[in-house]
């Protein structure tokens, strides 16, 4: 089966990405690549779980919106079905649940049913297969969990149930019942479903995947208020307990393999940590079936739900709805094919790095010694070694290490302080010297100043004014002939540090200002006299030239008139003059 390049379902709004690395910390498989401080999702590694979307404090991570695709489908297909995932009972208010079918029909859908219809069929098939196998089988309803096994736990692929998810089961049912040209739109809380719909072997079954958030936006844009919609029955409703699928243990209860925590025939895992640790369990206690859900507490906590409700309130809504009378005809057993195939597809060939390569990067970040490897996790990785491996594989940057960047900042600060030609001194609130650069030591003709009161070297009054809050910034000349000090002092408090800073800019020695001013005046007078002489000489030469030019011109005109008169004589018809 060919493995195609995956289409990204999650991307990054770079304008909002702020170097917090939270997405790196929460991503269960570290599918976030950081380049020049910008975090982006590597589609080959991504599970589409949407954890980064839900957790990003700046809203920089976003999943792909497919509303235009759904709208186009309604315009181009004669028949389009809407499949509503069972988590809708937790995503919407109880009074709105039976109004959703009418709202979806107003949007243009011809068939509206619960995806739990397909969940019931998958659960029944799962129970039958689980009883025939010795090793525990893994449910395949959660596409993020399936993707994790295929990409990162390939040894467990044989344990995956060879069954499609409820979404795909329902899609096959609709296509079989209404024809292959029927459109099928799935609406749920899961972002990973968008990627599942594009699996090559399942292409064409699900035409579009929307989240509950997208549905809410669509209804708002079309001016459809659920409060103004009538209650209406679904075209098909599920049998049994299939409405429990979106909560932890729901699929197992539907399959009849677990009715409570005392049952040992199945294991429900929700949240990545439980999923990671529990998928490889053996036959201990007679476990036949493992239900993995990537989102903690199940699909009612998916990233596509826009709800302020407490997660336990959502769960309670689902439980109550599962016990409510069914509103619509119950779906019969399907004749659609429920089989599926899964295969290992690691995101990329494993990259091996030598211990020397790892050691070099550790040393570059100041963590060459084991005691300097803090394993603080601020960068998003569990250990310094994991971060180094990510750096070497091109997924991370050295600058993501917060302790390393702090040391770099301190070193730059120290370098600036030591190379500054101005005297710089840092004081505590008691006006004792914490740090002073070489330029300040030269200014006060002393060394080894740390711990000494500033009053031993300069007048402390400016610093006392700043420390007491009398002035926020002191900026004035500071002269002390007895100490040989001549400088301009700029003193100010350091925010959030409870410290004071003083910068001494050297001034000319007393009397030097007057000497410089006198020298400048003398030079100015001299230059003015030279300019005056040049201007007078230029004027004289110009006048002389102009006079010579005028005299020569006058002589030339007289000669010209005389020549014309001597040659022409009196003109014809003219009156003679005496």
Give the predicted meaning of each segment.
Residues 2-4, 9-12, 18-42, 47, ...:
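Iron-sulfur cluster-binding cysteine motifs and their immediate structural context
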Residues 398, 402-419, 513-516, 520, ...:
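Short, charged amphipathic alpha-helical "coupling" segments at sensory-output junctions
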Residues 408-441:
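Sensory modules in modular signal-transduction proteins
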Residues 440-450:
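PAS/PAS-like sensory domain cap-loop motif
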Residues 493-538:
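Sensory coupling linkers of modular signal transduction proteins
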Residues 520-578:
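Signal-transducing coiled-coil/dimerization helices and immediately adjacent hinge/linker segments
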